[in-house]
Amino acid sequence: KGDCYVKITVDGAGKEGPVVLDLFGKAIADRIPGPARMPELVRRLPEAGRKAHTEKYIAQNFLGYQYLRGAYLAEYELKGQNLQGFILDCGDTKSAQAVVSRFAFAGNAPAGALAAGGKAFRDRYNGDIQLGWQGRFVWGCTGGDATQRQVLAAAIAKSLKGGKLIQ
């Protein structure tokens, strides 16, 4: 709500768990000013194939890298394959280019040629990653096969364009 993103989860709460979480969440939301909606970049993650309630915000160390900060992500199932799509707002074009360059030269070998969604990398820790970037944004996905990663990365780019965040 407003500029805040709060996600509450619990394990082993029994039947009452969802009811208590809902009441607790509403009590928090009532104290936060602004409209009740997801942050802009969560709304830019495509809905097609997105698994319900998997949206997250990772403030730092996204994918285990200190320089990957402020990632909005969600889990997807496309053609029976599990993927994770993400968007980072790097603040400006220069910072986004620096993030991509640093990732590319961090020992991540190319996993394929330039594609519609950007560039594919083979990350030694996270497997194959499809990255796209334009302006201040970096986006991409992990998991699934190369085709589904390209499809999801292209869908994220299209959604960013639809929100007029990139051209």
Question: For the regions a protein language model found, what residue spans apply to each?
Answer:
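Soluble, non-membrane globular domain cores that form compact, hydrophobic packing
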Residues: 1-167
